[in-house]
Amino acid sequence: MDNLFTFLHEIEDRYARTIFNFHLISCDEIGDIYGLMKERISSEDMFDNIVYNKDIHPAIKKLVYCDIQLTKHIINQNTYPVFNDSSQVKCCHYFDINSDNSNISSRTVEIFEREKSSLVSYIKTTNKKRKVNYGEIKKTVHGGTNANYFSGKKSDEYLSTTVRSNINQPWIKTISKRMRVDIINHSIVTRGKSSILQTIEIIFTNRTCVKIFKDSTMHIILSKDKDEKGCIHMIDKLFYVYYNLFLLFEDIIQNKYFNEVANIVNHVLTVTALDEKLFLIKKMAEHDVYGVSNFKIGMFNLTFIKSLDHTVFPSLLDEDSKIKFFKGKKLNIVALRSLDDCINYVTKSENMIEMMKERSTILNSIDIETESVDRLKELLLK
């Protein structure tokens, strides 16, 4: 980890990170994080009864548990704004909301109606404006006009699906769904699977998302703010997430190790100089501290922050290159999966930029109207 941050610091005058995802590999020593969190979230409907430590409340916006039988969101109401009457309701036509109408539940309903949650994304994805039923086309080909075409409503206790078809092309369907959600206090519950993955998610107020899988491996999607400047800010954000995450684990799992690790992590946040932060991170790796010793890069992107004032020559890019140009002038390096990958493509990017500058200078010095076609091809296509 320290070597990665050292290199990102070396190039931060030219490149800034955008997407940054990483994994914390499961360790036997820390126990069943997934199972214990699942048990706590499944049995409670108040945020305070899950997260006892009030010091970390401002950092955590929501907890989500999703498996085949149940999806449950527990929200921290204090992290949401007070809505006025003109606040846009996003999802009423997708959901039937059942609530006990208490003050706490009514506030949760208000938040759910206005937040673009994963439930909204899921139900929007499963609503299909047009879908071709190829099985029914086959019936038409082989069975003539007497083939049976389905349209109508299919439903269970929590999901209603309406299938409509055009009388002239009955194999083309329009599918719409409505989902029932039960809101009690801070909990938003629906039955059945509402995600591709079976995970527990911790959503932070800074938009970082931690996904915990059944084997307690974690996938962390580190958010980025517009005011993030350089590697030191990135380290502070990552270790701020670590600090609050590990205190949450200590809260739920009752494993004092996480409290010890949180204190070590806090030292990284407390020191101000980058060299001091990197020194502490290196020491954590040497002592096999959770969060550093089991850190594994998932994927990250870099963007070239300087302006490209010269002509861009796309022909210099390999077909499978991770160097991409967006909108003609924006250079990004995408889907980097290791430090070696990063060093390799930054080097290629630097060399390519120099080559483009040289070609651009030549191109600007010649008379395009009189120059030979072969010479122009050599500049533009090779």
Swiss-Prot record:
Q: Does the record bear Transcription in its keywords?
A: yes
Fetch the InterPro entries from UniProt. Poxvirus_intermed-TF
Record keywords: Activator, Transcription, Transcription regulation
Q: Which family does it belong to?
A: Belongs to the poxviruses A23 family.
User: What is the annotated quaternary arrangement, including any partners?
Assistant: Heterodimer of a 45 kDa and a 32 kDa subunit.
Function text: Acts with RNA polymerase to initiate transcription from intermediate gene promoters.
What is the protein's given name? Intermediate transcription factor 3 large subunit
Biological source species: Ectromelia virus (strain Moscow) (ECTV)
List the top taxonomic levels of the source.
Answer: Viruses, Varidnaviria, Bamfordvirae, Nucleocytoviricota, Pokkesviricetes
Q: Gene encoding it?
A: VITF3L
